[in-house]
Structures are given as structure tokens and as C-alpha cells.
Amino acid sequence: MTDSAARRDGAAAGAVEVSCATAPVRVWDALVRLAHWTLAATVAFDLVRDDGDRLHRIVGYVGAGAMVVRLLWALVARNHARLAELKPSLQGTRAYLRAGAPRHVGHDPLGLWMVWLIWALVLGLGVTGWISRLDAFWGEDWPIDIHAWMADALLACVLVHLLGVLGMSWHWRENLPASMLTGRKRGGDARR
Ligand code: HEM
Ligand code: HEM
């Protein structure tokens, strides 16, 4: 083989390697995306329409339901949605931060804490909203006081979540909001 032919072959092999390494990978399946955008829309709606009327209550239960479906899905899913990918770890978070927050294809260890906090608050809002309407708690202020406090905490978490998504999009030079729409991310330097 001549030098130039060898160079051509080498370049072609390199091209194949590069295109395989950066080919898009499926990360968020349809159920994860549907549950995410349902949760986002219902939370945003209830934070604005906060008078506790029938519509507020129905929309709130739909959001909590979307979250429960997502968590049940984690029990059977085999992709990045599975429960094994949702286990937060202090040690993993420390190592991740020490390494300069390297790119993750699934949830990164730091963002995972916020995901669980948001889910816990949505569950708490569903429960406190429900018990505030029970006859047993008629005249009691504390269920709705806790509900209001959790709603404020959720608003703060959502703002941090959005800052996190934008910050990591910039840090990794990757459009994370688009990945939650299409379900795809680029392959390559993925950790998991
Ligand atoms: C994502 C879920 C939810 C969010 C973000 C949310 C948010 C809020 C907010 C911000 C308020 C106003 C609190 C205040 O007085 O300062 C409120 C009130 C209330 N919410 Fe929710 N909520 C959610 C789910 C629910 C659910 C599932 C119920 C079911 C019963 C519910 C029932 C109520 C009631 C009864 C009030 C009291 C209204 C009043 O008397 O002033 N909420 N909610
Ligand atoms: C009230 C609004 C929102 C709530 C409550 C919320 C909540 C969540 C939750 C619970 C997850 C975990 C998803 C899962 O594993 O099932 C998540 C992930 C994500 N959310 Fe949101 N979200 C909201 C708004 C948004 C918006 C407006 C965007 C886009 C600008 C966004 C972008 C993302 C992305 C990109 C991820 C995946 C993060 C990653 O790559 O690890 N979210 N969000």
C-alpha cells in the first residue's frame, strides 16, 4: 500500500470512529419526557392559580400522578430511567465535584438531589392539599400552612433546577432542554 493510500484508509477509519463516538444516543424515553413535561406544566399552573379551587386540585393531583407513574416506571425500565440510575450518593457527588463536574449522559450526581427534592415536595403538596380538605381537619390551619410553605420551597427548587440545566448546558456545551424534548443526547465522552 502506498503512503497516501495508507493515510486515506487511516483517515477513513478515524472518521468512522469519530462518527460512532459522537452518534446520538437515546437517553430519555417517551414516558420520562411525557411525565417531565406534565409535571412541569401542572406545577407551573398550580403555582400561578393558587386559590385551591377545583381546577387547582385536579391539576395538582395530575402532577402528583405523573410523578408516581414515573417512579413506577423506574422499577421496570432498563435505560437511564431505571431506579439504579436514580440512587443519590454523597460519595459520588463529592467525587463528581472534585473531578470538575464531568459530562454525564443520564442524571449527574448533583442534579439527582434536586430531582428527589422536587419529587418529595410534589408528593407533600398532594398529601397536604388532600388532608386540608378532610372533615377531620376542618378549621385547622396547619395543613394549608405546610402546603403553602412547600409550594414556596418548590418554586425555589424549580428556579435552581432551571439554573442548573442552563449552567450545565453551558458547561458541557450541550443543549439539555432539547434532550428533554427529543430524548437524545450526543454520544462520546459519556460517563454512563
Ligand atoms: C404541584 C402541586 C401543587 C402546587 C404547586 C400547589 C400550590 C399551591 C399554592 C402556592 C397555594 C397558595 C398557598 C397560600 O395560601 O399561600 C395553594 C393553596 C391550596 N392548595 Fe395547592 N398546590 C398543589 C397541589 C394541590 C393539591 C393536589 C390539592 C388538593 C386538594 C391542593 C389544594 C390546595 C388548597 C385547598 C389550597 C388553599 C387555598 C386557600 O384556601 O387559600 N393543592 N396551593
Ligand atoms: C415546574 C417546572 C419543572 C419541574 C417541576 C421539573 C422537574 C424535573 C424533574 C423531576 C426531572 C427529573 C426527570 C426524570 O428523571 O424523570 C427533571 C429533569 C430535567 N429537566 Fe426539568 N422540570 C421543570 C422545568 C423544566 C424546564 C422548563 C426545562 C427546560 C428548560 C427542564 C429541563 C430538564 C432537563 C434537561 C432535565 C434532565 C436533566 C439531566 O440531564 O440530568 N425542566 N426536571
Task: Name the predicted role of every residue range.
Residues M1-R192:
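Membrane-embedded alpha-helical bundles that constitute the cytochrome b-like, heme-associated redox core
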